[in-house]
Protein backbone atom coordinates (compact mmCIF):
# COMPACT_ATOMS: atom_id res chain seq x y z
CA UNK A 1 0.00 0.00 0.00
CA UNK A 2 1.59 3.23 -1.21
CA UNK A 3 0.23 6.49 0.22
CA UNK A 4 0.76 10.23 -0.16
CA UNK A 5 -0.27 12.53 2.68
CA UNK A 6 -0.62 16.30 2.34
CA UNK A 7 -1.72 19.12 4.58
CA UNK A 8 -0.95 22.75 5.38
CA UNK A 9 1.31 23.61 8.33
CA UNK A 10 -0.13 22.23 11.56
CA UNK A 11 -2.60 19.87 9.87
CA UNK A 12 -1.24 16.91 11.83
CA UNK A 13 -0.09 14.97 8.78
CA UNK A 14 3.21 13.95 10.41
CA UNK A 15 1.45 12.83 13.59
CA UNK A 16 -1.03 10.72 11.62
CA UNK A 17 1.71 9.45 9.32
CA UNK A 18 3.45 7.94 12.33
CA UNK A 19 0.25 6.20 13.36
CA UNK A 20 -0.18 4.88 9.84
CA UNK A 21 3.34 3.43 9.61
CA UNK A 22 2.93 1.72 12.99
CA UNK A 23 -0.47 0.22 12.18
CA UNK A 24 0.29 -0.88 8.63
CA UNK A 25 4.07 -1.37 8.82
CA UNK A 26 4.87 1.12 6.07
CA UNK A 27 8.13 2.90 5.30
CA UNK A 28 8.00 6.60 6.27
CA UNK A 29 9.44 9.05 3.73
CA UNK A 30 9.04 12.59 5.10
CA UNK A 31 10.18 15.46 2.90
CA UNK A 32 10.64 17.69 5.96
CA UNK A 33 12.94 15.19 7.68
CA UNK A 34 14.97 14.75 4.49
CA UNK A 35 15.35 18.52 4.12
CA UNK A 36 16.40 19.04 7.75
CA UNK A 37 18.92 16.20 7.54
CA UNK A 38 20.49 17.85 4.50
CA UNK A 39 20.57 21.25 6.21
CA UNK A 40 22.22 19.72 9.29
CA UNK A 41 25.13 18.55 7.13
CA UNK A 42 26.22 22.19 7.02
CA UNK A 43 27.44 21.99 3.42
CA UNK A 44 26.83 24.54 0.65
CA UNK A 45 23.58 22.91 -0.46
CA UNK A 46 22.31 22.74 3.11
CA UNK A 47 23.08 26.40 3.73
CA UNK A 48 21.27 27.40 0.55
CA UNK A 49 18.26 25.25 1.46
CA UNK A 50 18.11 26.83 4.91
CA UNK A 51 17.59 30.26 3.34
CA UNK A 52 14.43 29.03 1.61
CA UNK A 53 13.08 27.34 4.73
CA UNK A 54 13.67 30.35 6.99
CA UNK A 55 11.59 32.51 4.63
CA UNK A 56 8.83 29.91 4.37
CA UNK A 57 9.49 29.35 0.66
CA UNK A 58 9.45 26.05 -1.21
CA UNK A 59 12.76 24.59 -2.30
CA UNK A 60 13.46 24.53 -6.06
CA UNK A 61 11.74 21.54 -7.67
CA UNK A 62 15.01 20.07 -8.94
CA UNK A 63 16.47 20.00 -5.43
CA UNK A 64 13.54 18.42 -3.61
CA UNK A 65 12.87 15.97 -6.46
CA UNK A 66 16.44 14.68 -6.25
CA UNK A 67 16.34 14.32 -2.47
CA UNK A 68 12.96 12.58 -2.19
CA UNK A 69 13.33 10.30 -5.22
CA UNK A 70 16.78 9.22 -4.05
CA UNK A 71 15.17 8.16 -0.78
CA UNK A 72 12.30 6.44 -2.60
CA UNK A 73 14.72 4.30 -4.61
CA UNK A 74 15.62 2.50 -1.38
CA UNK A 75 12.01 1.49 -0.68
CA UNK A 76 9.76 1.07 -3.69
CA UNK A 77 6.69 -0.54 -2.11
CA UNK A 78 4.59 -0.12 1.05
CA UNK A 79 5.51 3.47 1.84
CA UNK A 80 3.91 6.73 2.87
CA UNK A 81 5.33 10.01 1.54
CA UNK A 82 4.69 12.96 3.83
CA UNK A 83 4.67 16.46 2.29
CA UNK A 84 5.61 15.65 -1.29
CA UNK A 85 4.82 16.47 -4.09
CA UNK A 86 4.07 20.15 -3.48
CA UNK A 87 3.95 21.52 -7.05
CA UNK A 88 2.77 20.37 -10.47
CA UNK A 89 6.40 19.89 -11.53
CA UNK A 90 7.02 17.66 -8.53
CA UNK A 91 3.96 15.57 -9.38
CA UNK A 92 5.36 15.03 -12.87
CA UNK A 93 8.77 13.99 -11.53
CA UNK A 94 7.23 11.60 -8.99
CA UNK A 95 4.79 10.03 -11.42
CA UNK A 96 7.51 9.50 -14.04
CA UNK A 97 9.62 7.76 -11.40
CA UNK A 98 6.70 5.59 -10.25
CA UNK A 99 5.78 4.66 -13.83
CA UNK A 100 9.36 3.67 -14.64
CA UNK A 101 9.43 1.36 -11.61
CA UNK A 102 5.93 -0.08 -11.94
CA UNK A 103 4.65 1.55 -8.75
CA UNK A 104 1.17 2.99 -8.16
CA UNK A 105 -0.15 5.35 -5.50
CA UNK A 106 -3.21 3.81 -3.84
CA UNK A 107 -4.32 6.78 -1.74
CA UNK A 108 -3.61 10.53 -1.56
CA UNK A 109 -4.82 11.99 1.75
CA UNK A 110 -5.22 15.77 2.09
CA UNK A 111 -5.79 16.84 5.72
CA UNK A 112 -7.35 20.30 5.50
CA UNK A 113 -7.46 23.01 8.19
CA UNK A 114 -8.08 26.77 8.04
CA UNK A 115 -5.28 29.35 8.14
CA UNK A 116 -6.39 30.48 11.61
CA UNK A 117 -6.21 26.93 12.91
CA UNK A 118 -2.85 26.43 11.23
CA UNK A 119 -1.29 29.43 12.97
CA UNK A 120 -2.80 28.48 16.35
CA UNK A 121 -1.48 24.95 16.19
CA UNK A 122 1.98 25.82 14.93
CA UNK A 123 2.64 28.39 17.65
CA UNK A 124 2.50 25.57 20.21
CA UNK A 125 4.19 22.88 18.14
CA UNK A 126 7.40 21.28 19.35
CA UNK A 127 9.69 18.87 17.48
CA UNK A 128 12.19 16.31 18.72
CA UNK A 129 15.59 17.44 17.49
CA UNK A 130 16.78 13.83 17.22
CA UNK A 131 13.94 11.68 15.79
CA UNK A 132 11.49 14.31 14.51
CA UNK A 133 8.54 13.27 16.70
CA UNK A 134 5.88 16.00 16.86
CA UNK A 135 4.32 17.37 20.06
CA UNK A 136 2.10 20.30 21.04
CA UNK A 137 2.35 22.12 24.35
CA UNK A 138 -1.46 22.14 24.69
CA UNK A 139 -2.87 19.25 22.64
CA UNK A 140 -0.12 16.62 22.75
CA UNK A 141 2.70 17.54 25.18
CA UNK A 142 5.65 15.26 25.86
CA UNK A 143 5.44 13.48 29.21
CA UNK A 144 8.58 15.23 30.40
CA UNK A 145 8.78 18.89 29.24
CA UNK A 146 11.54 19.35 26.70
CA UNK A 147 12.22 15.61 26.37
CA UNK A 148 10.99 13.23 23.65
CA UNK A 149 8.83 10.29 24.79
CA UNK A 150 10.20 8.10 21.99
CA UNK A 151 13.97 8.59 21.98
CA UNK A 152 14.68 10.95 24.88
CA UNK A 153 15.97 13.65 22.55
CA UNK A 154 15.59 17.39 23.08
CA UNK A 155 12.16 18.81 22.14
CA UNK A 156 12.40 22.26 20.54
CA UNK A 157 10.41 24.89 18.65
CA UNK A 158 11.46 25.19 15.01
CA UNK A 159 12.78 28.51 13.73
CA UNK A 160 10.21 28.59 10.91
CA UNK A 161 7.20 28.20 13.25
CA UNK A 162 6.53 31.93 13.75
CA UNK A 163 3.02 33.20 12.82
CA UNK A 164 4.35 35.30 9.93
CA UNK A 165 6.21 32.45 8.31
CA UNK A 166 3.37 29.99 8.95
CA UNK A 167 0.92 32.37 7.25
CA UNK A 168 3.22 32.57 4.22
CA UNK A 169 3.71 28.79 4.12
CA UNK A 170 -0.05 28.27 4.32
CA UNK A 171 -0.70 30.59 1.38
CA UNK A 172 1.99 28.92 -0.71
CA UNK A 173 0.54 25.50 0.10
CA UNK A 174 -3.00 26.46 -0.92
CA UNK A 175 -1.86 28.23 -4.09
CA UNK A 176 0.11 25.18 -5.26
CA UNK A 177 -2.39 22.46 -4.39
CA UNK A 178 -4.96 22.94 -7.17
CA UNK A 179 -3.12 21.00 -9.93
CA UNK A 180 -2.07 18.33 -7.42
CA UNK A 181 -5.65 17.80 -6.26
CA UNK A 182 -6.86 17.75 -9.86
CA UNK A 183 -4.32 15.11 -10.86
CA UNK A 184 -4.95 12.71 -7.99
CA UNK A 185 -8.71 13.16 -8.25
CA UNK A 186 -8.30 12.10 -11.86
CA UNK A 187 -6.45 9.01 -10.64
CA UNK A 188 -9.35 8.23 -8.30
CA UNK A 189 -7.14 8.17 -5.19
CA UNK A 190 -7.61 11.66 -3.69
CA UNK A 191 -9.51 12.11 -0.42
CA UNK A 192 -9.79 15.31 1.63
CA UNK A 193 -10.06 14.84 5.40
CA UNK A 194 -11.42 17.46 7.80
CA UNK A 195 -8.42 18.10 10.03
CA UNK A 196 -10.24 20.19 12.65
CA UNK A 197 -10.67 18.57 16.04
CA UNK A 198 -8.50 16.50 18.34
CA UNK A 199 -5.96 13.91 17.22
CA UNK A 200 -8.23 10.96 18.00
CA UNK A 201 -11.19 12.60 16.28
CA UNK A 202 -9.25 13.17 13.07
CA UNK A 203 -7.67 9.72 13.23
CA UNK A 204 -11.11 8.12 13.31
CA UNK A 205 -11.86 9.90 10.02
CA UNK A 206 -8.70 8.51 8.46
CA UNK A 207 -8.52 4.98 9.89
CA UNK A 208 -11.63 3.44 8.27
CA UNK A 209 -10.46 4.64 4.87
CA UNK A 210 -7.03 3.09 5.38
CA UNK A 211 -8.54 -0.17 6.62
CA UNK A 212 -10.65 -0.36 3.46
CA UNK A 213 -7.68 0.23 1.15
CA UNK A 214 -5.48 -2.17 3.12
CA UNK A 215 -8.05 -4.99 3.03
CA UNK A 216 -8.73 -4.39 -0.66
CA UNK A 217 -5.04 -4.66 -1.52
CA UNK A 218 -4.65 -7.81 0.56
CA UNK A 219 -7.54 -9.46 -1.28
CA UNK A 220 -5.94 -8.56 -4.62
CA UNK A 221 -2.70 -10.19 -3.52
CA UNK A 222 -4.53 -13.41 -2.66
CA UNK A 223 -5.76 -13.76 -6.23
CA UNK A 224 -2.47 -12.92 -7.91
From Swiss-Prot:
GO terms for cellular component: cytoplasm
Gene3D superfamilies listed in its UniProt record: P-loop containing nucleotide triphosphate hydrolases
Protein name according to UniProt: Adenylate kinase
Region (NMP) residue spans: 30-59
Pathway, per record: Purine metabolism; AMP biosynthesis via salvage pathway; AMP from ADP: step 1/1
Quaternary organization: Monomer.
Comment text on domains: Consists of three domains, a large central CORE domain and two small peripheral domains, NMPbind and LID, which undergo movements during catalysis. The LID domain closes over the site of phosphoryl transfer upon ATP binding. Assembling and dissambling the active center during each catalytic cycle provides an effective means to prevent ATP hydrolysis. Some bacteria have evolved a zinc-coordinating structure that stabilizes the LID domain.
Enzyme Commission number(s) from the entry: 2.7.4.3
Keywords tagged on the record: ATP-binding, Cytoplasm, Kinase, Metal-binding, Nucleotide biosynthesis, Nucleotide-binding, Transferase, Zinc
Taxonomic source organism: Thermococcus sibiricus (strain DSM 12597 / MM 739)
Sites where the protein binds ATP: 10-15, 125, 134-135, 197
Amino acid sequence: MNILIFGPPGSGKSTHSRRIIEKYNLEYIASGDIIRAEINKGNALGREMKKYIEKGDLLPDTVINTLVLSRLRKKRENFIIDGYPRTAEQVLALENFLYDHGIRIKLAIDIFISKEESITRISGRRICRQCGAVYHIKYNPSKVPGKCDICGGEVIQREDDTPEIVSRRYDIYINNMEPIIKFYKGQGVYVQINGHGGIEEVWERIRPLLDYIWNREKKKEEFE
